[in-house]
């Protein structure tokens, strides 16, 4: 796996670069002017809205890097839709496939996704999934997630068996152990029943 700059400055720089376009688009149409805010009660390096797979993965990465993290969840329990999804995950060129002699490739995975997605997929993101899925599997297994051992599902839309089957039978098989891992990190704060209302932006809306 490639080296990642997890210093506070490096992490935040990467995060801003990755999300800047989305944040700017949202802030252009919404946002509370900074001049209207009288005081700040708390400060965090990273604020995560939602506690599904993406939110928890981000919180783990940032928390382990030593950043102060706040994760907000509007429901009374964490996980959102991620907790009730099927939970199986497609990962081309994984160790189980190789051990069972299943021939797969990044190109075949992308081809399958484009066909099933009617050609409107973002191929660069599909490539990222293919390149990083084995790192993702390792991360969740390290958190305590359990898959059916030595087994690949042959799911619809795929040319070969390439999907891991989560033992729990749903996304809760990820959410519960990831949540337990997050609770061990003292600089990560998780708040349920906490609805996100709006961004605070500079008066000219150039900064969030």
Regions found by a protein language model. Give the residues of each.
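N-terminal secretory signal peptides and thylakoid transit peptides that target proteins
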Residues: 2-19
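Hydrophobic membrane-targeting alpha-helices
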Residues: 23-31
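Aromatic pocket-lining residues of Rossmann-like dinucleotide-binding sites
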Residues: 62
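Conserved N-terminal/central alpha/beta ligand/cofactor-binding core
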Residues: 14, 18, 68, 74-206
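Residues that mark the start of a beta-strand
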Residues: 45, 67-68
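N-terminal Rossmann-fold NAD(P) dinucleotide-binding loop
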Residues: 55
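Beta1/beta-strand and adjacent pyrophosphate-binding region of the FAD-binding site
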Residues: 40-52
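A short, basic/flexible loop-to-alpha-helix module at the beginning of a structural domain
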Residues: 31-42
């Amino acid at each position: 796996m490639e080296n990642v700059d997890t210093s506070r400055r490096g992490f935040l720089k990467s995060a801003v670069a990755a999300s800047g376009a989305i944040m700017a688009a949202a802030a252009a149409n919404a946002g509370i002017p900074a001049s209207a805010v009288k005081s700040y009660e708390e400060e965090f390096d990273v604020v995560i809205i939602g506690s599904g797979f993406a939110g928890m993965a981000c919180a783990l990465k940032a928390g382990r890097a030593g950043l102060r993290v706040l994760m907000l969840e509007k429901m009374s329990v964490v996980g959102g839709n991620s907790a009730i999804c099927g939970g199986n995950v497609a990962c081309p060129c994984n160790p189980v496939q190789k051990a069972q002699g299943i021939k797969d490739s990044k190109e075949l995975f992308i081809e399958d996704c484009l066909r099933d997605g009617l050609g409107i997929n973002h191929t660069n993101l599909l490539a990222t999934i293919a390149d990083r899925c084995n790192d993702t599997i390792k991360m969740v297994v390290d958190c305590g997630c359990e898959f059916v051992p030595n087994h690949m599902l042959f799911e619809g839309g795929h040319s070969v068996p390439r999907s891991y089957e989560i033992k729990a039978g749903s996304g809760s098989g990820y959410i519960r152990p990831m949540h337990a891992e997050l609770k061990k990190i003292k600089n990560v704060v998780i708040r349920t029943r906490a609805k996100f209302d709006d961004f605070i932006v500079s008066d000219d809306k150039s900064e969030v």
